[in-house]
Amino acid sequence: TVGMMPNEMLDNLKGMISKRQIDRLWVVGSNNDTAPIIDASFRRLLGILEKHFTSTPYLISNRPSSSDFAMYGQLSQLVNFDPTPREICHEVSLRTVAWVGLIEDQSGIEVDDEQWGSIDTLPSTVKELLAEIGKGYVPAQLANAKALENGDKEWQTEIDGCLWKQKSFPYQAKCLKLSLIHISEPTRPLY
């Protein structure tokens, strides 16, 4: 296990992992220019989730869904491991911190189809959440896809009233394409 590694080996592993993660920051557009945009959006997201979790235990219904597990995948790292966002999470939304702990183990939950809500019963915070995601994610995805279509290695667009510049990333264009297929043909398998 990692805990039993000799210190020199552990330090090498730590350096290798840190370098790999830092070298990939371009993938998410994280740099000094975009940091304020990312921070503001993250804080707004946490504020929405704080409000949301006062009325419902999960993201879109009274039982966990794929949206919970997708959001958990991202937030678990930010709440549990990265010290900067962890501090922000504890400052802005303790309910989100608790929710990450809840989603960690759903093995004992009993679910039935009665627990699914309908679009008419979604809390207003779901619309706020989608609006926040759409404010940054959609313009980025569209600009990235257009850049790749034009053969551009970089792209820029306005996000949250600020200029966002980033290297083009084919995987994100693939995600956009699959999302658009799913929206237009919800029952079609994506793969």
Residue ranges and their predicted role:
Residues 1-41:
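Internal, well-ordered alpha/beta segment that forms a basic, Gly-enriched binding/recognition surface
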Residues 28-33, 55-60, 82-88:
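Inter-helical turn/loop segments and adjacent helix faces that build the functional surface
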Residues 43-44, 73:
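A conserved active-site cap/scaffold subdomain adjacent to cofactor or substrate pockets
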Residues 44-48, 55:
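Ligand-binding pocket segment of bilobal, Venus flytrap-like solute-binding proteins
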Residues 59-79:
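GST superfamily/GST-like fold recognition
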Residues 72-165:
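Active-site/pore-lining binding-face segments in mid-to-C-terminal subdomains
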Residues 172:
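Conserved phosphate-interacting/catalytic interface
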Residues 181-191:
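Single conserved hydrophobic/aromatic residue that forms the stacking wall/gate
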